[in-house]
Amino acid sequence: MTDGGVQVERVGDAPIITPASHPSIGTNIQGPSVIRAPAWLPDPLGRYLCYFADHKGSFIRLAYADAIEGPWTIHEPGSLHLADSGFLVEDLAIDAETLERITSRYRAALGDQLPVSLLDDLVTAHIASPDVHVDDDRREIVMYLHGLEALGDQRTRVAVSTDGIHFRATPETHGPSYFRCFRHDGWWYALAMPGRFFRSRDGRTGFEEGLTLFGPDMRHSAVRVVEGATGAELEVFWTRVGDAPERILRSRVSIAGPWERWCEIGEPVEVLCGAAPQSMVRLTSWPYEVELVAQRAA
């Protein structure tokens, strides 16, 4: 299918990774981020590396393949583990009064879109939602991931690796969950949930918050910078809280000029709907951050 600017092609008739792929990964498969292994990576497991998580898991999973279509093999030990992430490693306790107070605040903000797993979100120690990039200058793989920093406070950290398997977490936290990062005009930028933008000079320290676009129901996203008719644009593929079946939307953001003036271009367009068989889709080839892997977790 197309939306006038992007052609979407389904590849295969099943997800590339499922709970049947290996018992170590569990049944909740969340947040895949795929890179092409750079030439300088020593003894890569495969040409492509896929980092993903259980949304309340204790380590970042890792799969590898020599073709984007697969077959994909699970690297059973995974990559970064909770104990080495810098985040809380034990679940927190919460009393009924505090839970009700927090639930009321969420209900006032989100209405009937209140998360089903709100209690787990508030107290469960975990790491999830990796966003992985190749830093050729430093010859490092850079991972943005989130975890539980305090009661109800999920934050993003950076972890780095020289072999694509073993990661070292850095101490600083940078913002809320679901950082999706991109480079533009001498800065590293991050789009976090829901539609909040951050920036840093080096992409590893000192992220500052700027504008917010989209709406409060924006959830997961993937981003890339493209050249539009009037200058640089950010192409955003994203999902929306409450959509059933889940669908992937595409939005365009003008990022020409100061970020205070960034703005959405037109209305979001649906490019994929979960009503069809769930599988991998190829949108386009991006250097290192390759074809977007889209699968709907049950």
Where on the chain are the PLM-derived regions?
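Carbohydrate-active catalytic/glycan-binding domains of CAZyme proteins
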Residues: M1-A298
